[in-house]
Regions:
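Long, compositionally biased, intrinsically disordered segments
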Residues: 1-4, 27
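Short beta-strand segments of immunoglobulin-like
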Residues: 19-26
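Non-catalytic extracellular/periplasmic "stalk"
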Residues: 30-32, 43-190, 198
Length: 282
C-alpha cells in the first residue's frame, strides 16, 4: 500500500526584535528587557547573561516578551542574548545592546570578631541549625568559617531554588513600587559589601553581603511594598526567620531576621499588608 502524506518542513528560525531594554547594567545590578519573538511554532524564548538563563514572560500578546536580567556579583562577564527556539529545532540568538558598567562603587569592610561572640552568640546560632550539619570543630575559627561560609552558601542555594521552582506566569506588577519595608528606617548595611573578618588581627574568613540592611525600632512592622505571593517561609542558618515573596516578571523580595511572620507559603499579599515584625535590634 502506498501512503501519501503532506508535510510542512520548517527550516525558518524565529524572528527576534528588540522592543525596549535598559541602556546599561552595572555589575551586581539588573536590567529590563522587552522583545518581540515571532514564529509559526515558537517553543521557548529566554534571555541569557552569558552564564545564567532568565525566563521571559508573555506580555500583551503572544509575540511580546518581557523580563528582568541580572548581572550577579559572582559573574565577571556579562553579555545579554535572547534565545528563541521553535518546535522544529530552529534557533535564533539575538544579542541585546546593553552597555556594561563595571564601575559601581561597592564597599569593603574589615570586621573584627570578638571572642565573646564566638563563645556566645555563635553557639546560639549553631544550635538552631539542623544537627546533621554539626561536626567536631578544632577551634573557634573553624566554627566561625563553617557558619559564615558553608551555611551562607546553603542558605543562598535554598533561596535560589525557591525562586527557580516557580512555575506560575502570574504577574502582580501592574503598579510597581520601590521597596520600603520599614517606615522611618535607615540603611546600615549595603548590598555588595565585601566583608573580611579578623580575629586578633588575623584574617579568618570573607563574604559578600547580598542584602540591604535596614534598621528601625524593636518589633517594627514589616510592610509589603508590592503585591505578590509567598514562595518561602523558613528559618535559615545565617538569615534567621525569612520570607521570600514573588512579585511577577521574575522579581522576588526577601525579608530576613524577622521576629515573627503572619503569612504562609502560597498566600497572596497586598500592598501595605503587614508581613511580620522585626527582631530585638529592629
Amino acid at each position: 500500500a502506498n501512503i501519501e502524506l503532506s508535510l510542512v518542513v520548517d527550516t525558518t528560525a524565529p524572528v527576534v526584535k528588540n522592543i525596549a531594554s535598559s541602556g546599561q547594567i552595572v555589575r551586581g545590578g539588573s536590567a529590563v528587557v522587552a522583545v518581540q519573538a515571532k514564529d509559526m511554532a515558537l517553543d521557548n524564548v529566554y534571555i541569557s547573561n552569558g552564564t545564567d538563563n532568565f525566563k521571559l514572560f508573555s506580555y500583551l500578546n503572544n509575540d511580546i516578551y518581557v523580563g528582568i536580567i541580572a548581572w550577579p556579583l559572582k559573574n565577571k562577564f556579562f553579555s545579554a542574548q535572547v534565545v528563541a527556539k521553535d518546535k522544529a529545532g530552529n534557533i535564533t540568538k539575538y544579542n541585546l545592546p546593553i552597555a556594561r558598567n563595571i564601575n559601581a562603587p561597592y564597599y569593603r569592610s574589615n570586621i573584627a570578631i570578638k571572642e565573646d561572640f564566638l563563645n556566645g552568640k555563635l553557639n546560639e546560632l549553631l544550635a538552631q541549625i539542623n544537627q546533621k550539619h554539626l561536626k567536631p570543630f578544632e577551634n573557634n575559627v573553624e566554627r566561625f568559617v563553617f557558619f559564615n561560609e558553608t551555611i551562607r552558601q546553603e542558605d543562598e542555594s535554598r533561596i535560589l531554588k525557591a525562586c527557580s521552582d516557580l512555575n506560575s506566569n502570574i504577574s502582580f506588577a501592574e503598579d510597581f513600587h520601590a521597596f520600603m519595608p520599614l517606615k522611618g528606617s535607615k540603611v546600615v548595611g549595603n548590598f555588595g559589601d565585601y566583608r573580611t573578618y579578623f580575629l586578633n588581627k588575623e584574617k579568618i574568613s570573607e563574604a559578600v553581603h547580598l542584602g540591604i540592611d535596614v534598621a528601625s525600632v524593636k518589633n517594627a512592622p514589616i510592610i509589603a511594598s508590592n503585591k505578590g505571593v509567598v514562595l518561602l517561609k523558613s528559618h535559615l542558618g545565617l538569615y534567621g526567620n525569612t520570607l521570600l515573596l514573588y512579585h511577577g516578571f521574575g522579581v522576588s523580595s526577601i525579608y530576613s531576621h524577622m521576629q515573627e511572620s503572619y503569612v504562609q507559603v502560597s498566600d497572596e499579599v497586598s500592598v501595605g499588608q503587614e508581613l511580620g515584625k522585626t527582631g530585638q535590634t529592629g
